[in-house]
């Protein structure tokens, strides 16, 4: 595949077109299957949309390319899909490559569902768990503390990585306090500070290749451009490919 492009392609299909050990860094956040966990992949009806919060979330999922199914799979199918994606990421990562996988603990039936359920079934090693403190949440529960955090799982093929936390003289903890990004016609954009923080830990005189297989509005790719690295983005929906290309064009023309 040609570098420094956003491809309108399904994440798994795009990954399968990449050569073995061809990517230095993967930074991504897949759909969370929030509705699939709740509805077990059943078609959504008015009976499923009992709360205003669920209705808002449903509308956001419809906005995600107009395809509700992207966030409404049977949970076992979703987990199998994530395992397949992650194992393809393992294949395309270089031996000292790293993947940063943003996900969250989800609630179902009063119990927390952790991404570790499927992470430990992949070929990747969990090198470190980073807590992303977003500082605010639209979700308020009378029986729980406010859920203001998500997780960024640093996944590797082994112990060796390109990480160098000392080169820039800035040593960070594993808790990152970074506010949510302002929406940019995508329902769940990455804050660029989050991706910048990751890439700052991988200073290199080489042109590293950075991949985002769920690139959305391409914040990962823009951060890679800032660092002088090459990028690849996969996005299933053409409207977000167009949004990405527009954002990249505006950024590079500054």
Label for each model-derived stretch:
Residues 1-134, 143, 147, 156, ...:
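S-adenosyl-L-methionine-dependent nucleic acid methyltransferase catalytic domains
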Residues 152:
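Short hydrophobic/aromatic beta-strand element in the GNAT-like acyltransferase core
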Residues 160-163:
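Short helix-loop capping/hinge motifs at secondary-structure junctions, enriched
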């Amino acid at each position: 595949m040609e570098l420094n492009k956003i491809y309108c392609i399904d994440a798994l299909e795009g990954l399968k077109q990449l050569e073995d050990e061809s990517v230095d860094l993967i930074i991504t956040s897949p759909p969370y299957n929030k509705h699939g966990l709740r509805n077990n992949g059943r078609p959504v009806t008015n009976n499923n949309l009992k709360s205003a919060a669920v209705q808002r979330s449903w509308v956001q999922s419809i906005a995600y390319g107009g395809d509700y199914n992207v966030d409404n799979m049977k949970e076992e199918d979703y987990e199998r899909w994530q395992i397949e994606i992650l194992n393809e990421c393992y294949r395309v990562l270089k031996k000292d490559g790293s993947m940063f996988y943003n996900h969250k603990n989800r609630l179902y039936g009063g119990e927390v569902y952790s991404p570790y359920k499927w992470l430990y079934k992949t070929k990747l090693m969990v090198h470190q768990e980073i807590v992303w403190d977003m500082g605010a949440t639209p979700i308020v529960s009378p029986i729980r503390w406010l859920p203001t955090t998500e997780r960024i799982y640093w996944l590797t093929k082994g112990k060796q990585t390109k990480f160098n936390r000392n080169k820039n003289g800035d040593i960070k903890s594993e808790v990152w306090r970074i506010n949510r990004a302002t929406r940019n016609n995508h329902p769940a954009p990455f804050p660029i500070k989050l991706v910048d923080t990751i890439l700052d830990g991988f200073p290199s005189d080489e042109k590293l290749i950075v991949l985002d297989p769920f690139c959305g509005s391409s914040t990962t790719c823009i951060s890679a451009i800032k660092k002088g690295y090459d990028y690849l983005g996969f996005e299933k929906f053409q409207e977000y490919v167009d949004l990405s290309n527009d954002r990249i064009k505006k950024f590079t023309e500054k």
